[in-house]
Curated annotation (Swiss-Prot):
Encoding gene (name): rpsL
Name under which the protein is recorded: Small ribosomal subunit protein uS12
Modified residues (3-methylthioaspartic acid): 89
InterPro entries: NA-bd_OB-fold, Ribosomal_uS12, Ribosomal_uS12_bac
Annotated source species: Shewanella oneidensis (strain ATCC 700550 / JCM 31522 / CIP 106686 / LMG 19005 / NCIMB 14063 / MR-1)
A Pfam family recorded for this sequence: Ribosom_S12_S23
Entry's Gene Ontology cellular component terms: ribosome; small ribosomal subunit
Molecular function GO labels: rRNA binding; structural constituent of ribosome; tRNA binding
Amino acid sequence: MATVNQLVRKPRAPKVDKTNVPALNACPQKRGVCTRVYTTTPKKPNSALRKVARVRLTNGFEVTSYIGGEGHNLQEHSVILIRGGRVKDLPGVRYHTVRGALDCAGVTSRRQSRSKYGAKRPKS
């Protein structure tokens, strides 16, 4: 335990939390422009062609964002919204594309978990 005199000379340093999504600058989402849309392979033991986009954000950051759902309409110069959330089997991918916002269309014919994929309610 530190003495009062020690604390007067050098106060306790506050704990600093490190963020997992530094490019968001404490915002819930950020807008950006796709600079490259491509597929990449996950790390072992998984195997797939995961759809990702390289995005230049409005604050100048350039990040890699995962495009969830089956099929997408993104290409270079598409304006998209990204949110936090990493993809465990893709190293360096710490952001998700928000489906159904700005230039990114929602997933067509999606019936369940529609809100996560920007899909409208089907006409019963």
